[in-house]
From Swiss-Prot:
Name by which UniProt lists this protein: U2 small nuclear ribonucleoprotein B''
Matches recorded under PANTHER family: U1 SMALL NUCLEAR RIBONUCLEOPROTEIN A/U2 SMALL NUCLEAR RIBONUCLEOPROTEIN B
Region described as Disordered: spans on this chain: 100-157
Positions with biased composition (Polar residues): 123-139, 146-156
Organism: Arabidopsis thaliana (Mouse-ear cress)
């Protein structure tokens, strides 16, 4: 239900999110879920005590935000129904673009500083590990590129083969995308082979319907999905 005293704008405020989900996974999942409504400019989620279970998503268009609020109200996201409304304050990215940005107050800055320190303390130390830009950045395996494989010409199948996924993709992130289409059954991922997944539907017609709009969908800007029918 839209909040009457908050005028429609490009940012939406989301509550009742699962607090056990890690921040980066939460942001990626929200991006995947809400990209269907329009271009997303920013996703903000902090894990400080006061801001847990909340997030903000900013679209490039007000109409996209409106569609998202109406259609995703009470949507079960990580086993909890989301509560959505328009955000009260303009997002930083919009304010900067319009030249009206005012820095956050000291208290908010301090909260973000504490959050960054907490994340840094939990991040594994890679100082002596392989260079992030070196050939071993992905355990010696080159990052997948957007190259269609021969499997794109496979005959229709009720199982889709997904390639070029970011290695941090989770089954829940994919489920949020593919369960929007009728006949969805399950996601299958292989731990030993990151970057690929299988999505099963009840029949090959339903699989084809899902394939068309999601072909090339970008979970991250660098990773357009490559979808083909799986081998029978």
């Amino acid at each position: 239900m839209l909040t009457a005293d908050i005028p429609p704008n490009q940012s939406i405020y989301i509550q009742n999110l699962n607090e056990r989900i890690k921040k980066e996974e939460l942001k990626r999942s929200l991006y995947c879920l809400f990209s269907q409504f329009g271009r997303i400019l920013d996703v903000v989620a902090l894990k400080t005590p006061k801001l847990r279970g909340q997030a903000w998503v900013t679209f490039s268009e007000v109409t996209a935000a409106g569609h998202a609020v109406r259609q995703m109200q009470n949507f079960p996201f990580y086993d909890k129904p989301m509560r959505l409304q328009y955000a009260k304050a303009k997002s930083d990215c919009l304010a900067k673009a319009e030249g009206t940005f005012v820095p956050k107050d000291k208290k908010r800055k301090q909260e973000e500083k504490v959050e960054r320190k907490r994340e840094d303390s939990q991040r594994p130390n890679t100082a002596n590990g392989p260079s992030a830009n070196g050939p071993s950045a992905n355990n010696g395996v080159p990052a997948p590129s957007f190259q269609p494989s021969g499997q794109e010409t496979m005959p229709p199948n009720n199982i889709l083969f997904i390639q070029n996924l970011p290695h941090e993709t989770t089954s829940m992130m994919l489920q949020l995308l593919f369960e929007q289409y009728p006949g969805f059954k399950e996601i299958r991922m292989i731990d030993a082979k990151p970057g690929i997944a299988f999505v099963e539907y009840e029949d090959d017609v339903q699989a084809s319907i899902a394939m068309q709009p999601l072909q090339g969908f970008k979970i991250t800007p660098q990773n357009p999905m490559v979808i083909s029918f799986a081998k029978k």
